[in-house]
Amino acid sequence: MILGTPKADWLAEFPRLADLIALRPSEWFNPAIAPSAEALADVGLGAADVADASARLQRFAPLIARLFPETAASGGIIESDLVEVATFHDALRQHYAAELPGRLWLKRDSHLPISGSIKARGGIYEVLAHAERLALEHGLVGLDDDYSRLAEADCRAFFARHRIAVGSTGNLGLSIGIIGAALGFQASVHMSADARQWKKDKLRAHGVTVVEYASDYSVAVEQGRREAAGDPYTHFVDDENSRDLFLGYAVAAERLRGQLDAAGIRVDSEHPLFVHLPCGVGGGPGGVAFGLKLAFGDAVHCLFAEPTHSPCMFLGVYTGRHEQVSVQDFGIDNRTAADGLAVGRPSGFVGRAMQRLLDGYYTVDDDELFRLLALLERSQGIRLEPSALAGATGIARVTREPQGYRERMGLTSARLANATHLVWATGGGMVPETEMRAYLERGRSLLD
């Protein structure tokens, strides 16, 4: 019984569950998608909130440049490159034996400074927003001051009386632990069994307390939440429900628009933009997709990619039960090499906010992630962690789908030929060489 209903009844009502339960790579193109002008109201946030977040990051830029010299060249703004991957595109055409029209680009959040993943957006933003609230409340800075002052000894001593806590499979904990420690906060990261050892080691090297669990992500989050409850000096970063995290990710879209403009890429109804986003609990891809919909409206098509063993958002939105159901309820084990996506229960906040804004959801098995990892390195010399490749199969999924999605969305052959597909590479820039070699060896063995 699942929520009081026999599994057979679930399968009768939601036939795509059979593929999810059997761990077969599958896709579902959302029949409930609505015009963005209408569906954006579901989110409960708007363009003014994203602009406020962007302005906050600008205020903190001098401090970031001072604390992290690798950001000095960008003036303390944490941003990633956008690169066309035409050789990889050709390799995918051969790999999938399909034409795959359009152009293929990679958004390299894998190589964001400070923590080497998309979590450097939302995670760092939330800690900065919390630090700003404390600093303004206690008179450490004013809104028009130079925030690099917060690196001074008296400010660090003040922050040291406060704690930041978070539950994580790895990358979110890495970004929050590093920025928290850099500001002087005490930081504790509750890490699930899926977290890679090198990420734990890196956090400890920054003076962060790492609490390890033999259980999965949801348990780590709950324990982190429990630690923070009732302690006015502890701020819990709630990956399942945080609006600050969500807004930190959403800022990426306005910057991407500038990068696309600089590259001469048009985005409109005749030149659609498809953005393929790896999804764990949903905050990162949800926030980015929200920002993209604000920036490009119905000309952008956002799709979430998940491991076959951890399809929590697909499951939650498809059934309409969101965080009420977990993959484990259906006998799916939530065990995947894509550690950043090893989440069994989705964010109900993100699922409900974005359920009429996303074009679809698809799953990818671990072996395919490793094949794509090796194929990208072989064709372009770019190295990513397995999680970051989840969206690389998306161009084939959209091109070959049999569900009438393209016709429903008016995606004619001419429009697909003019399309830009963007794979959001979410992490991998800090993977140790020995670990990366093992990833590549596994991928090459599966390809050859």
Curated annotation (Swiss-Prot):
Reaction equations catalysed: D-serine = pyruvate + NH4(+)
The keyword Cell membrane is annotated on this UniProt entry: no
UniProtKB keywords: Lyase, Pyridoxal phosphate
Cofactor: pyridoxal 5'-phosphate
Keyword Lyase: yes
Any single Pfam family the record assigns to this protein: PALP
The protein's name: Probable D-serine dehydratase
Species this protein is from: Pseudomonas aeruginosa (strain ATCC 15692 / DSM 22644 / CIP 104116 / JCM 14847 / LMG 12228 / 1C / PRS 101 / PAO1)
